[in-house]
Amino acid sequence: MTNDDVLDEFRAAGALREGHFVLSSGLHSPVFLQKNLVFMRPERCERLCKALAQKIIATVGQVDVAVSPAVGGIIPGYETARHLNVPSIYVEREGGGFKFRRGFHLEPGQKVVMVEDIVTTGLSSRECIQAIKDAGGDVVAAACIVDRSGGKADVGVPLIALASLEVPAYPADALPPELAAIPIEDPGSRRLKG
């Protein structure tokens, strides 16, 4: 599956949006990938995650388990794990970091691929990878459907992206005038309070 094929899936779902968005990272961007509109269609999610699983196997070989960060990584993590024929587990935010809960655990030395939906700065990925390492897992790679950083995000392990985009993202105090003139939408989930 090519970059264009992946973006076509997002376009077909109405999930490639343009405007002025505050991302979960707190950065501002003229482009937002509304992944939930992609993942809500099982056949679309299956195509993307099957291709990601194939890319994982071609890059690092077989793994023992796929671990994802809740909430956004659960669906692509599960579907990718299904195509890898390995268990899918996830970590949840607790006390400022990610933790294994709900009976999930790793056996020491298990080969783990960390599966994300979208990577922008790599912060959530790094936090998830740290939780995996703390639990004794051997993180052989991280994988995502889309790397918005164009390969610049450092997650601390090799990053396998089904598609890579170089989408600009700016801190609030460094917005270009044309972006600052557009009303802000805040579709990110990190700042939601439950």
UniProtKB/Swiss-Prot annotation:
- What EC number(s) does its UniProt record assign? 2.4.2.10
Q: What name does the UniProt record give this protein?
A: Orotate phosphoribosyltransferase
**Gene3D superfamilies given in the database record:** 3.40.50.2020
The record's similarity note reads:
Belongs to the purine/pyrimidine phosphoribosyltransferase family. PyrE subfamily.
Q: Which SUPFAM superfamilies match?
A: PRTase-like (SSF53271)
- Enumerate the InterPro entries for this protein: OPRT (IPR023031), Orotate_PRibTrfase_bac (IPR006273), PRibTrfase_dom (IPR000836), PRTase-like (IPR029057)
What general EC class does the enzyme of this chain belong to?
A: transferase
Q: Name one Pfam family in it.
A: Pribosyltran
NCBIfam families attached to this UniProt entry: pyrE_Therm
- Subunit comment: Homodimer.
Q: Which organism is it from?
A: Caulobacter vibrioides (strain NA1000 / CB15N)
Question: Could you tell me which HAMAP family the record lists for this protein?
Answer: PyrE
Where along the chain is orotate bound? T120, R148
Q: Which GO terms describe its molecular function?
A: magnesium ion binding; orotate phosphoribosyltransferase activity
Record-level GO BP terms = 'de novo' UMP biosynthetic process; pyrimidine nucleobase biosynthetic process
Q: Residues that bind 5-phospho-alpha-D-ribose 1-diphosphate, according to the entry?
A: E116, D117, I118, V119, T120, T121, G122, L123, S124
User: Record's CDD domains?
Assistant: PRTases_typeI
Q: What does this protein do?
A: Catalyzes the transfer of a ribosyl phosphate group from 5-phosphoribose 1-diphosphate to orotate, leading to the formation of orotidine monophosphate (OMP).
Q: Which UniProt keywords apply?
A: Glycosyltransferase, Magnesium, Pyrimidine biosynthesis, Transferase
What cofactor does this chain's UniProt record say it requires? Mg(2+)
Provide the catalytic activity annotation.
orotidine 5'-phosphate + diphosphate = orotate + 5-phospho-alpha-D-ribose 1-diphosphate
Pathway listed for it is:
Pyrimidine metabolism; UMP biosynthesis via de novo pathway; UMP from orotate: step 1/2
